[in-house]
A protein has these predicted regions:
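N-terminal segment of the canonical double-stranded RNA-binding domain
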Residues: 1-14, 19, 41
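Short, charged, surface-exposed hinge/linker loops at domain edges
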Residues: 1-4, 38-109, 114-121, 145-146
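Hydrophobic pocket/interface hotspot
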Residues: 18, 35, 104
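Secondary-structure transition/turn motif
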Residues: 19-23, 127-129
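A short, exposed loop/beta-hairpin motif centered on an aromatic-Gly-Thr core
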Residues: 22-34
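Short amphipathic alpha-helices within nucleic acid-binding modules
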Residues: 33-38, 130, 134
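Short helix-start
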Residues: 113-138
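Arg/Lys-rich, glycine/proline-spaced intrinsically disordered segments
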Residues: 138-144
Length: 146
């Protein structure tokens, strides 16, 4: 499905900022090209979140008047289906993380990994596995502070 939203781009203190008119949040970039690319990435992540959790996307509005004196509007378009969200089975996530499938289930229960359902099957998002790999917590219990 295609998702189209209007963003306002304006100058912040150090970066150009892009805020969507119909959602909370936003993004930034060092120049106009980068802020447009970041707005596309931001919208993609928002749509993925809504698709994974069966949340409705807000109604898009167009022809909005910029809120900032130097603001200009851009249109951001993403094409995305729930089937295209990067994901792993629990077994694949376990292999990536170097743990057992049971440990992956524990990490999901502890909200350390994000999951979603697709066609009656539960999947682990690649983003949450990548984030966990980037953290690389050490094995065992944390040491007690003296």
């Amino acid at each position: 499905m295609v998702y189209v939203y209007e963003f306002e781009v304006y100058k912040g203190e150090k970066f150009l900022l892009a805020d969507p008119y119909d959602m909370l949040g936003g993004t930034q970039g060092v120049d106009f090209k980068e802020v447009c690319e970041m707005a596309g990435d931001w919208l993609k992540m928002e749509v993925e979140h809504c698709l994974m959790h069966d949340l409705p996307m807000p109604e898009a509005t167009f022809g909005n008047k910029p809120k900032h004196a130097d603001g200009q509007n851009i249109i951001v378009v993403v094409q995305l289906e729930k089937e295209n969200i990067p994901r792993y089975t629990f077994a694949e996530a376990a292999r990536q993380l170097g743990v057992t499938r049971g440990r992956v289930s524990q990490m999901v229960d502890a909200c350390l990994l994000e999951t979603f359902e697709l066609d009656g099957r539960k999947w682990v998002t690649k983003y949450s596995v990548d984030a966990r790999l980037a953290e690389r917590p050490k094995a065992g219990r944390p040491r007690k502070k003296k």
